[in-house]
């Protein structure tokens, strides 16, 4: 009788263990799907905001060349519409950051950055999602998203880019809430 009880208890524990493993696996898969959807949504939002900002910068530069206040306001509007803290900036064709909060940055050029080169060298690039970089101005790790800005004749005029603070996203619990 004792042996039978031990066998039944062992089988029951084994079944419970497998049930817990299946539930943990299902919960983990659901969480991963949720995080992927959240990041996909963020990337889509950034793409729309950057495309819109690039179009507005092109329009402003065509109508009012050198009007930094209007372009700075455009960038502030675009970044305020996003669900996380993002810094929007824009460069001229030489890679100098000339638009965005806290500009100008006279000694900071982004011409050597991959995201700048990709936009400069590829007129049809669209959204470029770069590898995380250590930002020179913010002095922290950032994820960079960029789009090309053109002159009215289609020539390269610079880029508009968004810097997403990686630590800020990880620490923002509200960002991951459904």
Where are these regions (language model features)?
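Extracytoplasmic/periplasmic ligand-binding sensor regions of membrane-associated signaling proteins
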Residues: 79-87, 93-176
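An N-terminal domain-start capping segment
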Residues: 1, 40, 44, 141-147
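Polar/charged, Q/E/K-enriched amphipathic alpha-helical segments with strong coiled-coil propensity
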Residues: 64-65, 70, 170
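Structural motif corresponding to alpha-helix initiation and N-cap regions
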Residues: 68-73, 112-113
